[in-house]
Amino acid sequence: MGSIFKDGRRILVRPKSLIICLCLISIIFTQLIRYQYQLIADEVQPTINEDHSSSQSLKNTKLNSTRSSSPISPPKSLNKLTSQEFWEHIFNIFEINKFDDGLKPLIKYTPKEQQLTTKIKTRDWLLSKANIFHKDIIRQYHESVLRNLPSKLPKSVYTPNTYGIVTIGGNFYSWMAYIQLLQLRKLGSNLPVEILIPSIEDYYKEAHFCDHVLPQYNAKCILVPEKLGFNVAKHWKFSSYQFKALALCLSSFQHVLILDSDNVVLSKPEKVFDSPVYRDNGMVLWPDYWERTISPEWYDIIGKPVVGNKQVRTGRFPVNIHNMLTSELEINETRFHDLEGALPDLSTESGQVMFNKKTHGKVMLMTLYYNIFGPEIYYKLFSLGALGEGDKDTFAAAALACGEKYYQVASSIRTLGYFDTTPGGGFHGMAMAQKNPQLDYQLFQKTNQNFKDLHLDWDNEAKDQFSANNKIPIFTMHCNIKKINPAAYMKDEKIANMDEKRMNVRFYSNLKFKLNDDDIYSPDNEKEKNKSEKTDNDPNEIDFELSRWQIVSEILCDQKITFQFLKDENMDEVCQFVKNTIAWLGKKT
């Protein structure tokens, strides 16, 4: 016999009845938990519900046209906030400074026929690209956010003195993230990895992958709703580039390398974390192909206008003999981003970013702000319609707004791809190879100091050291075109041999890399340069493409992990295609 209490009375219950009662209680509790998660999984627009009682800290306290100058304080001191309480406070700052629908659109591109067509991206050229409305209100909201965001992060947000990699998962992105992870382990890197899963629904579909597969490789999934907290996840809807900023914010590491899922590293990140380029700067970025197209009006919005009379660089290279622009004609013939106070060229390619949360905590929060409100204003304000609109320049912009330093690699992207030999074909760029940041930094510092000592500007020979085909080894391979999918490749007659059921082209220019190649070449040792050249039959040399397909075979054909995007495919046929491709690539090496 057992007993329970009902209406204050003790009632005897038979064991069988007690078991039934306990089962019912367990079922009810489980359903309540599932219901709570379902609330998070439902798509809810990023607006506040009419019923504000469940999320008092997110209630709409906006004024009609101004923002209160009083500080937006957390419910208790920052160091006493839990991680979820901290993010609720941060998103409350965003909510209070959200743009009313009546103000939109905040920015509108100018018709092509009204834009200036000069080749040089001058101030006037940039200003001709878009009209920005309600600038005083945008400035006021920006100032309010910048003033209220904390300068340092509480320890509940990250674990001090930890290093790791974070990337984005969910369906196809989990597949690419897993390839990235196995490539990392092939290099011998043991850095922990966290994969951001956007929703509870995504997690349900990949629970086995998250809970059983990843832990074998010192990796795990982190869920946006669990990290942000239920109130924030319920009231804000995230998409696209915003997840990268969230991945940075929600990762547990102090020192973070954030990678796009289709990006892989070719040398151990541990060495870069432990190098001067990272220690000196706290944030490391890499270049895109194009010059920056950030609107001059953004500099006014953040309270750091570019006056426009002192040229301090030509592109990404410093000018040691400063050119004072004394006439309107000179100003109109000078690139805006060559002027003192502007962010230097080139634009940023954000497929990889290195970040120290202790030194750049506020930069991280401002990066998040620019991405949360990116679709409404900042993506367009930073790109002005140029290629690559998105999160890429939000990192450098946040650093300037917060007054923090960073280093952007000077070496140009090396584009890898293949030539289409069919009539009308040409070169197909398939991947962006970014260079080792420490060796780039070392060479840049040395070269610039030499020219400073001589009181001269950089000559073309010096600039050529940072060309796409320089000696500095590749650090990451951002394989962003035709993202790897053997089930799709085998049906594409442009790239597959349909008779032999294998690939018919190499995507990555026969790229080979050496393990620990960053130890081989140093710009301080000219005699060592030749050692970084490719040699035949080098046992330490790895065929990048062959290695990539071997990882695909391991995942799909050995481990037999089936991701959602492959659930309707004939995996026997897919695996045969993979094996045939590996055999073909092996003959080519």
Swiss-Prot record:
UniProt-listed Enzyme Commission number(s): 2.4.1.-
Cytoplasmic side: 1-16
Alphabetical GO biological process terms: mannan biosynthetic process; protein mannosylation
Family under the similarity heading: Belongs to the MNN1/MNT family.
Pfam family, one: Mannosyl_trans3
Residue ranges of the region described as Disordered: 50-77
Membrane topology (UniProt): Single-pass type II membrane protein
Main enzyme class: transferase
Glycosylated position list: 64, 332, 530
Known function: Alpha-1,2-mannosyltransferase required for cell wall integrity. Responsible for addition of the first alpha-1,2-linked mannose to form the branches on the mannan backbone of oligosaccharides. Addition of alpha-1,2-mannose is required for stabilization of the alpha-1,6-mannose backbone and hence regulates mannan fibril length; and is important for both immune recognition and virulence.
One term under GO cellular component: Golgi membrane
Induction: Expression is induced by nitric oxide (NO) and HOG1; and repressed by osmotic stress, oxidative stress, and heavy metal stress. Expression is also regulated by TSA1.
Taxonomic classification: Eukaryota, Fungi, Dikarya, Ascomycota, Saccharomycotina
Name of this protein: Alpha-1,2-mannosyltransferase MNN22
Pathway(s) the chain acts in: Protein modification; protein glycosylation
Annotated Polar residues bias: 54-71
Localization per record: Golgi apparatus membrane
Keyword vocabulary terms for this entry: Glycoprotein, Golgi apparatus, Membrane, Signal-anchor, Transferase, Transmembrane, Transmembrane helix
GO molecular function per UniProt: alpha-1,2-mannosyltransferase activity
Transmembrane segments: 17-33
Superkingdom as given in the UniProt entry: Eukaryota
UniProt cross-references to SUPFAM superfamilies, sorted A to Z: Nucleotide-diphospho-sugar transferases (SSF53448)
